[in-house]
């Protein structure tokens, strides 16, 4: 009923007469002569290569190996009894082990109505999470002491807390330790549980080694990072992520989502739950974002392809492309409407996931971002690093080139150029360049 901690007092380079207990045994090969002397020291044949002594082989085959087989057979017998007595629960467990989703897992996902005031990405995600989790019993998680702020607490009846002596709850209290949280989630995922863990985006660096290992192991861990930009406002540059999006996007095999409104959050979660061999980072705003009118603009299910044309020229032949993710998409939509009123044909491309977009066919990518249209502006309240591959070197990239500042969001957006007028001016400059 308790974890087992195994402590092995060891000697690095054990048996090597000249290198045991030295850094040389750690950072470089022993060398042919030291290997020969080590074998002599251990009483092994000096010339044999890749030798496994008979006693060692017997210990593993007849000792450890036999014990493992006996334990597995006993466990399988117990599981057969469990399956007979609780067939539905056993079926759920087998589905979990196969990384399958229960039928109807997304039946409670509903679209959000258009709303100019909208809601924060974190708030929308909390609602979606609580719509999915009751239908996926092995979806469990928590936050690094920030559940109320990240909106990641499961609040439906029976969710409960995972505590010492009470292991049925589904809310984990990881404490203020992002790296430990990420490591715990990796362990849970390797047992086929579907874990999520949340924190402020600025603190993602603390968990980065665990995130990287999840990507190496190809396990579907879900990281929820909120307070995603200078939108944090008065908390200032220590809490305003700048380089963090670029850093996560640089990790191979990690899928990064930064949705633009509540309905993109819904569709991001729909995709996330169906990714069974990749970790995902879901990047969410603190501030409210307008919930776009999907009768007027493109459906949010374009999220599944990583990027899509959200608003377009009436003839489908834009003169300039406005590319953005997350909270800046609605700014681009407003700029699009202003350009439209001036007779300038623009297209707004919402790019919630670069990784998914780059997995699409070349035809699809070209249909969203036509190669012949070189007047391009990207907008993201973060480092512009990486955007050049979508804008081209001649395109304009509106982003953060310094750390942030402590002020209300509107003042910060004006200071750093994240305004409708600034985007419109950039679009005009691009068209003049043409």
Feature names for model-found ranges:
Residues 1-53, 57-283, 287-290, 361, 368, ...:
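Thiamine diphosphate
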């Amino acid at each position: 009923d308790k974890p087992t901690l195994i402590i092995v007092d060891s000697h690095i380079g054990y048996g090597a007469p000249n290198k045991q207990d030295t850094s040389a045994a750690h950072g470089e090969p022993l060398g042919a002569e030291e290997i020969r002397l080590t074998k002599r020291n251990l009483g092994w044949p000096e010339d044999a290569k890749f030798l496994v002594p008979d006693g060692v082989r017997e210990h593993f085959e007849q000792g450890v190996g036999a014990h493992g087989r006996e334990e597995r057979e006993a466990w399988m017998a117990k599981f057969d009894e469990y399956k007979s007595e609780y067939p539905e629960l056993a079926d759920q467990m087998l589905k979990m082990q196969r990384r399958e989703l229960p039928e109807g897992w997304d039946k409670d996902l509903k679209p959000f109505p258009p709303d100019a005031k909208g809601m924060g990405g974190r708030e929308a995600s909390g609602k979606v999470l609580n719509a999915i989790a009751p239908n996926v019993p092995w979806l469990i998680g928590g936050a690094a002491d920030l559940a109320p702020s990240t909106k990641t607490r499961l609040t439906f009846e029976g969710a409960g807390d995972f505590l010492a002596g009470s292991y049925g709850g589904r809310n984990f209290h990881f404490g203020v330790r992002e790296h430990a949280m990420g490591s715990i989630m990796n362990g849970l995922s390797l047992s086929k549980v579907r874990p999520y863990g949340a924190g402020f985006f600025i603190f993602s660096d603390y968990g980065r080694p665990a995130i990287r290992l999840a990507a190496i192991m190809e396990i579907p861990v879900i990281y929820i990072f909120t307070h995603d930009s200078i939108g944090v406002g008065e908390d200032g540059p220590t809490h305003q992520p700048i380089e963090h999006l670029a850093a996560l996007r640089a990790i191979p095999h990690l899928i990064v989502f930064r949705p633009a409104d509540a309905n993109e959050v819904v569709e991001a979660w729909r995709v996330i739950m169906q990714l069974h061999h990749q970790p995902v980072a879901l990047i969410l705003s603190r501030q409210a974002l307008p919930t776009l009118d999907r009768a007027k603009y493109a459906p949010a299910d374009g999220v599944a392809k990583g990027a899509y044309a959200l608003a377009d020229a009436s003839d489908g032949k834009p003169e300039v492309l406005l590319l953005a993710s997350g909270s800046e998409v609605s700014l681009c939509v407003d700029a699009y409407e202003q350009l439209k009123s001036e007779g300038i044909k623009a297209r707004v491309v919402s790019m919630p996931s670069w990784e998914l977009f780059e997995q699409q066919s070349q035809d699809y990518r070209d249909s969203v971002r036509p190669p012949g249209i070189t007047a391009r502006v990207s907008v993201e309240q973060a480092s512009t690093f990486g955007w050049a591959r979508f804008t081209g070197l001649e395109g304009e990239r509106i982003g953060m080139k310094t750390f942030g500042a402590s002020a209300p969001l509107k003042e910060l957006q004006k200071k750093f150029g994240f305004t409708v007028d600034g985007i419109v001016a950039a679009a005009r400059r691009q068209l003049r360049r043409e």
